[in-house]
Each structure stands twice: as C-alpha cells, then as structure tokens.
Amino acid sequence: MASNQKVIYVYESFRSTTPNFLGTLFVENVRGRESYSFEYDADWLKSSANYMYLDPDLQMYAGRQYPTGAKNVFGLFTDSSPDRWGRLLMTRRERILAEQEGRKPRKLLDSDFLLGVYDETRMGAIRFKLDKDGPFLSDDSKTPTPPWTSLRTLEEASRQFENDESGLEQKWIDQLIKPGSSLGGARPKATVLDTSGNLWIAKFPSKHDDVNVGAWEKVTHDLARLCGLDVPESMLIDFSKYGSTFLVRRFDRNGAARIHFASAMTMLGKTDGASAADGSSYLELVSFIKANGAAPKRDLTELWKRIVFNMAVSNTDDHMRNHGFILKADGWHLSPLYDVNPVPEGDELSLCVNEDDATISLDLALEIAPYCEISTKDATAMAADILKTVRDNWNRLAAECGLSRSAQEYMRPAFSLALE
C-alpha cells in the first residue's frame, strides 16, 4: 500500500506578533487520500494552561489527536484553507504548470490547498511551515500584496479569468493567485493593501450575477450599521459597466498584528453544509457564547439583533461559515458581521431560529429572545427599531449606491418583513 507522510509545523501569532510554535500537523497520504492528526507542542500547552480551546476536536492535552465523525480535517485548519474561489485559482495554476512542463496535472489535495495560501494574507493567525528554519507558507517575497491602486486591474483580471474557458491564461492567474487564494466563498475577490497598511477584501462583479451584488451588499452593510450592529468599515467603487466592487476592511488584522478568527462551523464542531436541514440552529451559537464567550451579554444581544436583521433583509445565506468568532486576550468574542446579502425570493434562513424552524418570522425571533437573556419587552422594542430603520432607509441607500428604480423594485420582496 503506497503511503507517505507530510509533516507540517503549525504556529500561532495571536498572543504576540512573534510567532509561537503551536504543534505538528501530520498528513498521511494513502493512495491519494489524506488523513490528519495533530499534536500540540508541550511547551505551548504549558504556557497556555488557562487558554481557550481552538477547536472542539483538539483538547488541550499532549499526544496525537484525530478529527471526529465525518470530518477529515480539523476545523482549525479548514478555516485557514481557501474555499471555492481560492481552490479554483490554485487548480487552474496547476493546469498551467503541467502544460508548461509537459505532464499531466496533479490532483491537488487538502494539504496542497492549505499550504498554497499566501501567508501574508492568510485569514486569521494560524501559520504553517514545512521546515522549522524555513519561511511561512506560502511564501513569495518578490510579489507583495497588491496595493489599492491595482483594484481596477484586479477586477479586470477576475473578469478575464472567469471568461477564459480554457483556464490557461497565466497572466490572469499570476495577478489573482496571491491576493485571492486566502479568501473563502465562490465569488471573485482579492485582498488589497491600503495606503495606511490595512488589508481589505475586494469583492468583484461576477459573470454569473443577475443583480449588482456588490451594490446590494453595500446597502445591507450600511443598513446593519444604522441598526447598531458591529460591522467593519466598507466602501463601494465602480470600475466598469459590469457591476460594483464592494470593499470591506479585514477584521482579522490590527495593523501588523494578526487576530485569530474561527468560523462557527469550526467552534461548534460542524461540517461544511451544516444547515437547518440537519437541525443546525442559532440556539447552538447561543449555547457557545454562554459557555465560552468573554462578553456573553453583549454578544447574545448582538446575535439576536442579527437574527432579526437577517430576517428584515432576507439574508438567507446565514450558514455556519458566515458566523464567526475572534480570539482576544480575554477569550472568544462574536466577530463583526460579514457576508450579508438580500435575497428577493428568500423565505427561510439557512439556520433554524429555534430547535426546528428556519422561517423568516418575527414571532420566532421573539420566541428565542429569553435564551439570549433579553426580555420580551426589550426584544419587541429592538425588533421594531431594526424594522423601522430598514424600512426608512433601504430605498435611500440603494439610490446612493447607484441602483435604479427597477433594481429596487426587483429587490423589494427581500425587505417585505420590514415593509409589512
């Protein structure tokens, strides 16, 4: 039986700007199928005796540990890996290299995708090496993170890349692979650096868009801010006739310091695709915050208001990957809101609100308010304020984002709860 092992050295940069050796990730490859195990570094465990766990499948003790259930890879490392867009870029790059070298394309495995993300823009604060004395991976000191001034070029590259059916135009891959491989989701995107040294995510128009997705995400983002929700800084720029580019400042960085981010999928021990269909619920997020949150009262209120807001704008893509937590010195905090978009035909959320119902219904949200330690009186007032804010501002914000009256009428059903 053909087998070989890859040893990956794992570091964290969330306790200081100096990387700390976290442990060793072992990847066993048997006939093209990988299996994973991880072992914490003994010194890291000693220095982190009272630290919060990083993954429910990785308990704070010495010795090899293995993923449980249907998972093949620990969620801690899934969060550091690219999603569909980044994987597509890496797969296309491998096809190009194979053609240049006159060989068959190599099938990329999970560890290839994990190590193929550029360290400089990798999400969160987990980092990887194949040699303890070598660079963090992936490394490319010759090509820095693209500056703000390259946004127009990057948008054009993403469009050409999507329209290149052969997938073998290297110049588009070269421009997109570094800034885009670190990010999740399926849409074209890239990380760029502003003049103050801050990282931003740029989400570009896609050829598959039926509406101006970037403009509508900016509308909902600004509505969330008006509703008092925790959202990062954002802006909207038009570079072409194909749609708007939505930019949002990354919340996993504070200057040069990295902030550890974990998706709710990871911290709740879920697998990709977990949804209302299998009973995944907001109540599980509530339980996690109560058990592990550093500021449970604040985060429970914030989470409940987000549920109401998601209903008010019909954000039906609120799955476990689109909720997350950031790790600070005092423990886990609910991350800022991200990836919120209106859906005109949406009538159910991705997650159950209570134990078994995902319907967009204010009554359901009010039903679980006590679990979030919010009185019925306060919840009713908060919900009324959110709905009024959405009702009074969505048209105005849409117009400010350049959306036509017909575009607004098309999207009107998404705001039906607020308009009732």
Regions found by a protein language model. Name each.
Residues 1-320, 324-420:
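Phosphate/dinucleotide-binding and metal-coordinating scaffold of catalytic cores
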